[in-house]
Amino acid sequence: MKKITIAVMSICLMGTLPASAQFGKLLDKAKEKVGGKSAGKKSGDFTTVWESEFENKATRIAVVDGDGSYVVGTDDNSASVLDKEGKAIWNGDYKKLTTNKTNKSEFQYTVWKKGGGYLFLFDERSLGTDRVACLDITTGKELWSSEAYQNLIPKGTKAEEGTDQGELETVKYIDELDAFFISQKASVIMVNAKTGEKIWETNRFKGGVGKYIYDAKRNEIIMVNFKPTALGALFAGFKNQLVKINASNGDILWDASFLGTIEKELVTRRAIIDLWVKGDKLFMYLDGLQVFNMANGQKIWSATYENDMQGSSGNSLIGGKKRSKMYKTLAPPLFTDNAVYIVMLGTRDRTKYVEKHDLESGKLLWASEKITGALCMPHIYKVGNKILVQVGGKIEVQELRYEEVSSSSGAAVGALTGFGGGGGTKQWVPYIFWDYKDQKNSVLSLDDATGLTAWRSERFDKRITDFVIHESKTLFVGDGDQFYGYDIASGTQFFDVKHNDANVGKAKDVIDFDDKVVVLSEKGLAAYNKKDGSRVYATEKIKGVDYFYAIGNNYFLRDQRNSKNIIYGIDMTNGETKGSVQSKGKGGSPKYGDGIDITEDGEYIFAFKGRKVEKIKVNN
């Protein structure tokens, strides 16, 4: 079983009460000698642009902004920032940089903005007042610090090694307003991100902000609350709230209730809920759809179900060996101009089926046949007068396993559980991976007018990959050993290729690439022409790949077997490897795994190992 390992986050916060430090005296002078060494040396087959070093060991954060202009490395007590040439911009100790002497920071995280961003620090003090501070990443100057905000994380949280993965349950950054919502016991406070100034406070909204939508035209925010897991005792009397707020002064324009409980994913801690605005209506996706009037918050219609699809196995975090949950088992709603299609879950028989509802009134227009034996129904598509349904497929699994880890890989499990410790001991270690379960797998085509079954494929024995749909005419899909092409209008199978003849192992995923479909497999890649299914190439040079990324015009594969983290750059025209980078350290983006970060255009990879940073060019 392949896995994607993610070090659980150590994150951090902010507060109010603006203050300014005597920056010139407190900031360590950036050392000129730490300029990036130009290279030309090869990393795999990639070219190293430069190598440089942070002024600290970068045990907490080691990341780069979207275009590679700023490279940030932090430990518990200090930060070091390099420019795109690998030269030091600034270095400093938090205690000297902050007026409130924020020091050992249990949680730290970055928020990137165009041309810079913020570094947030949270110093949880078990016997004193918690301290928060915000630094300007471009200069190292303190923007503000505060001791006004308490109980943003549980008391006694331990400082753990980890990666920069986002914000706390009690703090939500609102990018459109460059501001933060900070949840306290009796109120929510909106804070200016640059100055720490309190803009407004309301006691009519309680809990954390699970999801929000900002209406720039009216300067209004619609947001939904949830109960922070680790701080639940602070939010007694909690109730579900969906509110519209005047972003200027915090006035509550309307307050509605909703059905269901917002859960957080086991490892990522993302809220499992979505919000969309369609015309004058707000659509909430939480165990089905709930639809509200945007003007007054009144519920108009709903189509919901009882959801236990996340599942749970193993034991509790206390005394057990593993806890596991499944996600992304049901497709999100599919919207058209006048209708919405929803994958529904049968209450008693656990069947799955599709409903079509009128977007305006919610009237049920049709319900498809009920499918038994399928654990998941992860994707639906509208192509012409057909609704294409993927029955079966891969699911996302998130796990916490009680394992022995070294001090360098003892990721911040305390952020989730409060447990964790030193090197060479057992800790709760997080994993995220895609997995195929034994279930019914097939392609199902429904008539859009009636919901009746137009055609279905034969049952796939092994598994079913996601679909590639080409020019609204053809559908391509794999089942592990075979690769198929279907005519969408009629369901005619116009080719059936023996993928196992490519000698690259079972199909795991499919990639849409120009006039080809590239099949990512257990031992390598195979590509097939869309026109006739003929094989273009097959390469088994890369084994154990369990994930792929399309970044800009570049494609990357990832291998995480045996606690490794290797990123391969791939030329999809011929399947050849451009180069590879194997992580030898911590930090990096959680998206790409320990020790690795990649720019938004996919042109550069940054590799981190303690103090050392290497910038690598993808295309020579």
Which stretches of residues belong to each language-model region?
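Bacterial N-terminal signal peptides that target proteins for export
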Residues: 1-7
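Bacterial N-terminal signal peptides
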Residues: 7-16
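Sec/Tat signal peptide C-region and signal peptidase I cleavage site
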Residues: 17-21
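Secretory-pathway ectodomains
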Residues: 22-620
